[in-house]
Amino acid sequence: MNSVYNTYEKGMNRINQHIALILLQSIFCRQYNLIGINSTQALTIPIKQYHQKSRKMSTSKDIEVETSATSPAFANTSGDGEIPSFNGDEKAKASDFANYFCSYAQLYHQKQMLADHNRMAAYHSAIMGNADVFKDKVVMDVGTGSGILAVWAAQAGARKVYAIEYTDMAKHARQVMKANGVEDIVTVIQGAVEEIVLPIEEDGLECDDPEHPERVVDIFISEWMGYFLLRESMLDSLIRARDKFMKPATGLMFPSHTTMYVAPVQDEEERRMNCNEYAASMSDWQDFQETTKQVYGVEMEILKSDFDREQKDYYMWSSRWRELPAASVLSERKMIKVLDMMTCTIEDSKGVDMGDEASKFEFAVDGDREQGPISGIAGWFTADFKSRTDEVGKDSAPKLLDPTILSTGPEMGYTHWGQQVFYFASGIPLMQGQTTNITGSLEMTRTKENARLYNCRIKYASSRNSNNDGKQLMKSAPKEQVYMIP
């Protein structure tokens, strides 16, 4: 009987970390009133980042994991959903707050962004370096958070700044305005930007367009970007605000353009750790299953395949936040999407269409120069602060004399966005004297369950050619995998 209980104790110890994580998620969700979200959505909050960063490096042998074209948990989840414009729908507001806005009401979250030097330096340079275009202008900061961008706009000479914030962080933003002596210039408005009414007459503002009397804003500033640019789908709200409040011929967007990039990377320790933790979780299940049968007489094997799917989706088919060293990038980056913030539509913000030519990639990695294998594909973005390039405003809008670029690529070091890495189940080896080619495409779509989250479908194949005569030595079968960006 002792051996049975020893087996039980061993099995329970090995699954304790999984139970602890679930309990921790539950506590966090209750603390911040995250009612009605599922375990996958719970992992999108900082607990998941803490779990990823605190995992110990595994030294066990690399585990081969069977790949599938579409992971069952994410099958048929690509949707065309839009972020609700609310229009008084209190139920929609409550759901979106629980699933998205709530964490932005916490100062710890704001501090994480404010401590991002690359982020701060880029916005500060873009605003203060172009103070001439802010002088005497009307500015709107969408998603002001702590209000720092609104403060800079006022300091740069803006006549009026409207700082829009949906959460109770608006109360802190008002304190920040007063502490920095700009409370007479900056008006903090708490609410969804889709629903707010600007105090235009009260502030003495006039519009030259009688058909659109609310178009009084000269400059929009916003830090709306999420992981791999589009995650969180805040761009929808910014586009609606732009179309409603901006002067179309002379208005400016900060940032003005954004670009998404991908590149092959080497990050084998993390890739192998994901594989090994998946294998360990399945070993935990086996112990649990046997113990439950021996001690309690209940057969649980019927659930093994479902548990396997859950674990594989989490460990293998979810992208990972990484702060990659520049040396891990094995080839030139490939641009897969560009957004002009003056002309992009909500349809543009929904993702990356595999039918677009830009979504296709081709990389060549020289085995003589690089150490293999290729671990996966990484994605990141840049945000440009520059003059308008669209036909409507390129001649009539003010010119930015000091353009700025914010990059979240590995060459920049730490940003809170990091890079999203989509790991292959097995690394692609590099061989001396040979060039390894990867060709494929990437599709990014919103999930049906939550329009603020995205899935990425990556199709790829590899081949190797001799560096001497160019002869093809190997060609793999095409592979396809769907990843969630948590």
Q: Which role does the model predict for each range below?
A:
Residues 21-24, 34, 43:
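Leucine-biased recognition of intrinsically disordered, low-complexity hydrophobic segments
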Residues 58-142, 147-442, 447-486:
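Class I SAM-binding transferase module
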